[in-house]
Amino acid sequence: MDSPHIPVLLKPVLNSFKDIKNGTILDCTLGYGGHSEAILISNPNLKIIACDRDSESLSFCKAKFEKYSDRIKIYKSNFAGILNKIDHEDIRGILADIGVSSLQLDLDERGFSINSNNLDMRMDKNQTFSAKELINSYSKDQLADIFYKYAELPNAKSLAQKIVDARDKSPIKSAKELSSIIGRSNLKNRSVSIAILAFQAIRIEVNKELDELNNLLNLIKSSKINNAILDIISFHSLEDKIAKSTFKEWEKSCICDNFVMKCECGNNHSIGKILTKKPITPSEDEIKQNPRSSCAKMRIFHIQRNV
């Protein structure tokens, strides 16, 4: 069954797991199964535990992976919650692709696109809070805060005021209407339109994407997972910063304060090693085949605890 979504950085993902002879790979963001399918094909001794919040993609994948039913288990869960449901002992690889699928972007009813007639942006359709509720209920200051924090828009306050003024006349009901209020011009030195950046900020807030990533990383650190490769694929600078800074902290053996002259912590706190000093990015060929992959970055960490 062909996937309606092209998995990003597929070759680097497979390469990162190539030395894993057997065991289980945890796919924290199954989507339409592109990465998981390639992993299963690459090594018949590997199994997959996968999860996603999107009911539509889960239905697709349950049919897609029927022939691999003895090698893959699929759960409806966010990627932080899945760690509470599984045995950590056999996990040898973890993949988290922190992005929206092409199908989610393209389906009008999902309301992710600036041209959509809907205004939704929920990755989990069972979630009650959507972009429509956010846009029509957040205060001016709350809107400005997410535009500045998640999209780094210098005109965040004036943008928030535009939205408040418009909804005071009539509730904002569609993404198309919202994007016309925001405007589609580009900021100076930015190739992406203001509307796309603002929509990205709204999506991050609706789905609590940064919280989800932080929760996942915290749970991995406190878990019993060991001798495993962790791949984090991000599409936003804030997500990449979280992965980068977390991996740096995990690699530290000494966690004493900087002013301490002599180590007092035992110098044994490292839980592994960073395998990518710089993030892996898509090749020119991949970007040509899938332009949406252009801003993807992947960082890899080898979890190796002192036990």
Swiss-Prot record:
GO terms for cellular component: cytoplasm. It catalyses: cytidine(1402) in 16S rRNA + S-adenosyl-L-methionine = N(4)-methylcytidine(1402) in 16S rRNA + S-adenosyl-L-homocysteine + H(+). It is an enzyme of class 2 (transferase). One of its GO terms (biological process) is rRNA base methylation. It comes from the Bacteria. Keywords: Cytoplasm, Methyltransferase, rRNA processing, S-adenosyl-L-methionine, Transferase. Signal peptide: none annotated. It is found in: Cytoplasm. The keyword Methyltransferase applies. S-adenosyl-L-methionine binds at residues 33-35, 52, 83, 97, 104. Its EC number is 2.1.1.199. Transmembrane segments: none annotated. One of its GO terms (molecular function) is rRNA (cytosine-N4-)-methyltransferase activity. Belongs to the methyltransferase superfamily. RsmH family. NCBIfam families: 16S rRNA (cytosine(1402)-N(4))-methyltransferase RsmH. HAMAP family: 16SrRNA_methyltr_H. Specifically methylates the N4 position of cytidine in position 1402 (C1402) of 16S rRNA. This is Ribosomal RNA small subunit methyltransferase H. It comes from Campylobacter fetus subsp. fetus (strain 82-40). The gene is rsmH.
